């Protein structure tokens, strides 16, 4: 579950960039 949250954060960062 914690890994999923980190993955979501990574995806959001990629979208922002």
Curated annotation (Swiss-Prot):
The keyword Repeat applies. Residues 1-17 form the signal peptide. It comes from the Eukaryota. Keywords: Repeat, Signal. Belongs to the chorion protein family. This protein is one of many from the eggshell of the silk moth. This is Chorion class high-cysteine HCA protein 13.
């Amino acid at each position: 579950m914690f890994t999923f949250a980190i993955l979501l954060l990574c995806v959001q960062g990629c979208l922002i960039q």
